[in-house]
Amino acid sequence: MTLKIGIVGAGGRMGRNLITAVQNAEGVELGAAFERKGSSLVGADAGEVAGIGATGVKISDDLNQNTNFDVLIDFTRPEGTLEHIKFCVANGKKMVIGTTGFDDAGKQAIQTAAEQISIVFASNYSVGVNLVFKLLEKAAKVMGDYCDIEVIEAHHRHKVDAPSGTALSMGEHIAKTLGRDLKTHGVFAREGITGERKRDEIGFATIRAGDVVGEHSVWFADEGERVEIAHKASSRMTFANGAVRAAKWLNTKQNGLFDMTDVLDLNNL
């Protein structure tokens, strides 16, 4: 049976890539596409907006107007995603969430919703980035206690949250491995006379410039040597294809909260 996908934010950069990814994938089809109220794209064919030709799916501004989907893929903003979660819980729809920038209350709302529906919630849907998460855990076990750890990330000028969700996830994987709390050990800004660096800090640096899709590098730096683990994305299709892969994997799950580590079966590495 063909899995039907709904996409919110269909007219955005990521939304257009998601439409293309669904169209190219086997075993799935686009069932619904949505944009914010007042968007000039409402009523347009989703495929034409994505530049792949007509799909017969018109963009709507209300999830209640088109429930012809099994899984909703959401790469929007926290306030919108939280409303979409309520709809999916009420209507028994599964979700793939790529939105970043949630506060603790937002994350708890996702956790609560996952008691009733199945959700994949990840900061990054790239296969490569999720492999990097595991490599960081390995490096932290070997070098984390005596090295300075810094996370450097760069994204396009339009990204609204900083550090990126992926950078924070990298820090969380490292902190958990080392038995540290990122909230107390993370350093997100340095300016002026800061004093010497504390050994147990996990530092973050953010770049916003041009059209950078996404670049992340983690340093494990000691005196005399430095190990760098890095990932660079050159196309949003990497994330879109990963999200569709997650949706297909999620189709067999009735409820629960998962991430790409589960989807890719990386827990045993």
UniProtKB/Swiss-Prot annotation:
InterPro entries: DapB_C, DapB_N, DapB_N_CS, DHDPR_bac, NAD(P)-bd_dom_sf
HAMAP family, sorted: DapB (MF_00102)
Gene3D superfamilies: Dihydrodipicolinate Reductase, domain 2, NAD(P)-binding Rossmann-like Domain
EC number(s) from the headed UniProt entry: 1.17.1.8
Example of a GO MF term: NAD binding
Top EC group: oxidoreductase
Main location (coarse class): cytoplasm
Organism per entry: Actinobacillus pleuropneumoniae serotype 5b (strain L20)
UniProt entry tagged with the keyword Amino-acid biosynthesis: yes
Binding site for (S)-2,3,4,5-tetrahydrodipicolinate: 156, 165-166
Any GO CC annotation of this UniProt entry: cytosol
Active site: 155, 159
Lineage start: Bacteria, Pseudomonadati, Pseudomonadota, Gammaproteobacteria, Pasteurellales
Protein name: 4-hydroxy-tetrahydrodipicolinate reductase
